Amino acid sequence: MCPSEMGTLWHHWSPVLISLAALFSKVTEGRGILESIQRFSLLPTYLPVTYHINNADVSFFLKEANQDIMRNSSLQSRVESFLIYKSRRLPVLNASYGPFSIEQVVPQDLMLPSNPFGFTNKFSLNWKLKAHILRDKVYLSRPKVQVLFHIMGRDWDDRSAGEKLPCLRVFAFRETREVRGSCRLQGDLGLCVAELELLSSWFSPPTVVAGRRKSVDQPEGTPVELYYTVHPGGERGDCVREDARRSNGIRTGHSDIDESGPPLQRIGSIFLYQTHRKPSLRELRLDNSVAIHYIPKTVRKGDVLTFPVSISRNSTEDRFTLRAKVKKGVNIIGVRASSPSIWDVKERTDYTGKYAPAVIVCQKKAAGSENSADGASYEVMQIDVEVEEPGDLPATQLVTWQVEYPGEITSDLGVSKIYVSPKDLIGVVPLAMEAEILNTAILTGKTVAVPVKVVSVEDDGTVTELLESVECRSSDEDVIKVSDRCDYVFVNGKEMKGKVNVVVNFTYQHLSSPLEMTVWVPRLPLQIEVSDTELNQIKGWRVPIVSSRRPAGDSEEEEDDERRGRGCTLQYQHAMVRVLTQFVAEAAGPGGHLAHLLGSDWQVDITELINDFMQVEEPRIAKLQGGQILMGQELGMTTIQILSPLSDTILAEKTITVLDEKVTITDLGVQLVTGLSLSLQLSPGSNRAIFATAVAQELLQRPKQEAAISCWVQFSDGSVTPLDIYDGKDFSLMATSLDEKVVSIHQDPKFKWPIIAAETEGQGTLVKVEMVISESCQKSKRKSVLAVGTANIKVKFGQNDANPNTSDSRHTGAGVHMENNVSDRRPKKPSQEWGSQEGQYYGSSSMGLMEGRGTTTDRSILQKKKGQESLLDDNSHLQTIPSDLTSFPAQVDLPRSNGEMDGNDLMQASKGLSDLEIGMYALLGVFCLAILVFLINCVTFALKYRHKQVPFEEQEGMSHSHDWVGLSNRTELLENHINFASSQDEQITAIDRGMDFEESKYLLSTNSQKSINGQLFKPLGPIIIDGKDQKSEPPTSPTSKRKRVKFTTFTAVSSDDEYPTRNSIVMSSEDDIKWVCQDLDPGDCKELHNYMERLHENV
């Protein structure tokens, strides 16, 4: 396609493409241009609202990986994620900014998505039901199964009289039969024992189906699975009694269970045996040769215990003497030889009396042989001990053993314990108040302990708390420790790791039971997060010199007037600091991988815990205020350190640099705040994290209603910072009303920042805010303005704030949305409280002056004008784009041509596509349309060119068309085609058929007459007219002040045409062509000369 034709195509289609580009630019402007985010640092902007969590014992604010920019990019809102780890009451979340505050109770549904204790009237956040099978081996002679249930996480001292705990129903399934039992949780410990009487037929071997092989007898017994469900109690607080046995066959019992009821929870397995097996013996080894064995059990008065004595098979001793000493309450009543053919056993009577020690001499016979015996040792004799009634019950009786060999060689003393009790104990169970320990002692040095109580269970199901004679031992003291009295487990900060289901063993008499706990430890090293690690001087911002501030020593090349004035020095940038970590534990299974408290993508904000142990290594270079704000002091490099409270170990380090380079404040973002709304939502990435979204209300609804402002500053190095973190004494904000009829400004000396009050209805950019340095550092009477910003105001009386403002956005998706608008509240606190660094904003780590920690809100992007440094648009209101349509609705601010915004400007975005997707699709559509137009024009041109190929003979007989070329030196062009003929026949653009291609390619205009029935018609008038008749082009036109060439084609007409041909260029002289070439390129001019010469030759 030749260049002239391409120009023609562009001439026709450029309006369409320009319109599409303009439409696309408006879409992208309303949706938000993602590239504008690059003007900011990694720290997102947000409404600097303060969050506090009340009524919670342990709570943390969170950070999810790679989600801060997506969730906090709006000056109007702030999203924060938090975790309620431990609480005995419903927590309350408070959000405050300036004089406005709002509270919201965190509902239990968000903290407990699936609560098995929904039937109780108590707050059961940390409750966890634990089941203990007292005996997993069940014999036909005693076909009873007992399961102890208790609640972990329930405060034992916080018991109310009207507390209603749920009932538990236990199920045992074997083949097609079911047995059930029930109990109700009660008491301070919240426990109960459920009993099941198994059917005797269950102890027989499993039924063999025809055609299958008979199953081999399992040595571990026949397994039976146990399950339980949770149910509400009756009107009287009792559980519904169920039949212990069911004779009819039920398919695994499921047909008898209400499917709509609570689901079955697995307890574990038990094993059934038909007969008692020989009980296992415990061994008390006296030395390498002799050992005492006994059966661990509880005995009563009159019971006789037998102690077998064995000797190693490889022992070379042929003679030894065993001494057994007892105290009151125990009597040795007999000794008998177990292998009389091998050993000769005799009891000496060296001592007399009822409780005299027994001396037993064993002599190996010469002809004896122990080859018939099996095992590493064989039994020599048995000693019978009778138990008498002790004075105090329960009691522990001791039997002391010692072996003597010829030559006065003796062994160490060995002690056997005999437990005497009138009760028939079947098990002991250690109960812990909590199921987990969060080891914050590593961070704070304060011990974290969990109370433990040990209870015994008798054969009839009676539960008794054991206060004495309990022994305990931790399986790994690098993870968890236990007190000497076995009444609590604890961590003191000296632990090395965490672990899932770490075991602490508790023993009472011959019974023992493990306590499993999960210990979470902070992952080291900790992560120190600083919003800006390179702090610069701020050009033009002078602050008074105090003892803690020193001027930079490397600024000698700068003018002294620039660096300081009247005892002032340049301000250094401030940064925000917080400390994050993950709580982890070694998994219980093999592999050694780490388990996370919330997940590998979540970090916990622990700034408040380690605030007292965080310091700057060189305080002269930088200063840390409140553990959350870092202020540059002097040029240099230093580190932020977190020290261990128990040792000299450094838990974390972060390098900070204070530079000599100066930065300037390039923009001041202003957000109007007339009130706050608060909503809560469950995190989709974790069932324990909760998102809180605080949104600033913007609408002024009644006369004299007051509003506060929130400001962010942007520096030339790209960093953005909320103005709240700077000391209010180092600057002042001056607000000016641009329309005092609509809003007025109060500048009360007691208040740090100006207050805006509504007067009459109106809207627009009505307030200008100036950031001015402190008065003591002004070098002249003219105030030094650091930055200027504008605020968009909308005043509409009597209108609900829900419709016009994005602050009343509704959440979609799972979760609960609760809102409380306080836009009509008047300030109830002095402004210096919320503006000063000593105020409530920086009191704790819940303040979170960092990247946002939460879900999605509207994103507000400060946009720059062309040729300006300002990040605000012409309307000075922020363009919003949604960042996540599933968790927060998108509201788009479409710009108006007149620079104003009506009440319907905020439009709901499609919930199906994201903003980036819509923008990309629009761009793709424009490109596709442009390609389609190009192809259509190519085909059209090819068809026209094919039809224009006429025989050479016909060309000779045709007269040539002649073009009149005119040049205008004026800067005005015709704006429209009003001077052209309006009829359809006279508005046709075509190429004269009287020329061949070589000639027609030099026609620089296609405005020719249209041929109808072989007759050619010319235009009604010439295109170029005298300058007096021309219509002036607007001075702002992009084509103004340029020379324009306009060509008009006049074609030959038939001889009978009433208008003669005039101004034929064929008859023009060569001098007439020269003026045409004044503004053409040399090559184009030469081609025009050649063309004219050919025309002369043809003539």
Curated annotation (Swiss-Prot):
Which keywords are on file for this protein? Glycoprotein, Membrane, Signal, Transmembrane, Transmembrane helix
Region called Disordered, residue ranges = 797-858
**InterPro entries linked:** Ig_TMEM132_2nd, Ig_TMEM132_5th, Ig_TMEM132_6th, TMEM132, TMEM132_3rd, TMEM132_C, TMEM132_M, TMEM132_N
According to the UniProt entry, the coiled-coil residues are none
Which cell locations does it reside in?
Membrane
State the signal peptide span. 1-30
Pfam families from the UniProt entry: Ig_TMEM132_2nd, Ig_TMEM132_4th, Ig_TMEM132_5th, Ig_TMEM132_6th, TMEM132_3rd, TMEM132_C, TMEM132_N
Regarding tissue, the record states: Expressed in mature oligodendrocytes. Detected in the brain, lung, pancreas and testis. Highly expressed in mature neurons of the adult nervous system.
Return the Low complexity bias intervals: 835-848
The protein's recorded glycosylation sites are 505
Q: List the disulfide bonds.
A: none
Spell out which residues lie on the membrane's Extracellular side.
31-915
Per the record, ranges on the Cytoplasmic side are: 937-1099
Offer a single GO CC term for the protein.
Answer: membrane
Q: What is its main location?
A: membrane
Q: At the top level of its lineage, which domain of life is listed? A: Eukaryota
Query: Which residues are listed as membrane-spanning?
Result: 916-936
> What is the recorded membrane topology of this protein?
Single-pass type I membrane protein
Q: What does this protein do?
A: Regulate neuronals morphology via inhibition of the WAVE regulatory complex (WCR), a complex that controls F-actin cytoskeletal dynamics.
Give the family from UniProt.
Answer: Belongs to the TMEM132 family.
Known partners and oligomeric status: Interacts (via C-terminus) with NCKAP.
Q: What is this protein called?
A: Transmembrane protein 132D
* Source organism of the structure: Homo sapiens
| Gene symbol of the encoding locus | TMEM132D
